[in-house]
């Protein structure tokens, strides 16, 4: 299986912040990677485009992927509302690791987070399935608009997204 690369055009209050590209580990975590890829392209009729990063904690992570409700309470995968943890072999080794947000075991949907640091306490609990390939500095810039309480000072949006 080919490891796809997707992109996010990120804006801050409607102003361009930059484009990040993300390599998906489809060779090891195909179901999770396919969910994220399809939500990036919109080929199933729903997508990440226009959704925001609703939770940003500096030094920890930037969380987004709720395209059904903009507040972090919505979740929808290409397989239905939720799908099982595929495997937990990849580790949260540092900044740029892409992982599924969840509410416990086997509750993956559309929400994801990008690590801003090594977060080993998430190993075995969240499916890490990709890594920011280019422009991790955009993720670092996004951190400046978050607070320790996870609120954001600016609206950080996925203005466009797709697959290379």
Curated annotation (Swiss-Prot):
One Gene Ontology molecular-function label: cyclosporin A binding
PROSITE patterns: CSA_PPIASE_1, CSA_PPIASE_2
GO terms (BP aspect): protein folding
Domain of life the protein comes from: Eukaryota
Cellular component aspect of the GO annotation: cytoplasm
Pfam families for the chain: Pro_isomerase (PF00160)
Recorded catalytic activity of this chain's protein: [protein]-peptidylproline (omega=180) = [protein]-peptidylproline (omega=0)
Keywords: Cytoplasm, Isomerase, Rotamase
E.C. code: 5.2.1.8
Predominant location: cytoplasm
Recorded family membership: Belongs to the cyclophilin-type PPIase family. PPIase A subfamily.
Miscellaneous note of the record: It is one of six related genes or pseudogenes found in a cluster, thought to result from gene duplication, on chromosome 1.
Described purpose of this protein according to its UniProt entry: PPIases accelerate the folding of proteins. It catalyzes the cis-trans isomerization of proline imidic peptide bonds in oligopeptides.
Protein name in UniProt: Peptidyl-prolyl cis-trans isomerase A-like 4E
Native source organism of the sequence: Homo sapiens (Human)
């Amino acid at each position: 299986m080919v490891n796809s690369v997707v992109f996010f055009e990120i804006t801050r209050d409607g102003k361009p912040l930059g484009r990040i590209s993300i390599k998906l580990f489809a060779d090891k975590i195909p179901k999770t990677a396919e969910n994220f890829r399809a939500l990036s392209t919109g080929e199933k009729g729903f997508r990440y485009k226009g959704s925001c990063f609703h939770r940003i904690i500096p030094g920890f992570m930037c969380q987004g992927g709720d395209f059904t409700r903009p507040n972090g309470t919505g979740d929808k995968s290409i397989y239905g509302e939720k799908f099982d943890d595929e495997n937990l072999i990849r580790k949260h080794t540092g900044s740029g690791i892409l992982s599924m947000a969840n509410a416990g075991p086997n509750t993956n949907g559309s929400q994801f987070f990008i690590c801003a640091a090594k977060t080993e306490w998430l190993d075995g609990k969240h499916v890490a399935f990709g890594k920011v390939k280019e422009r991790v500095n955009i993720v670092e810039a996004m951190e400046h608009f978050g607070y320790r309480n996870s609120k954001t000072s600016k609206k950080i949006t996925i203005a466009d997204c797709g697959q290379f």
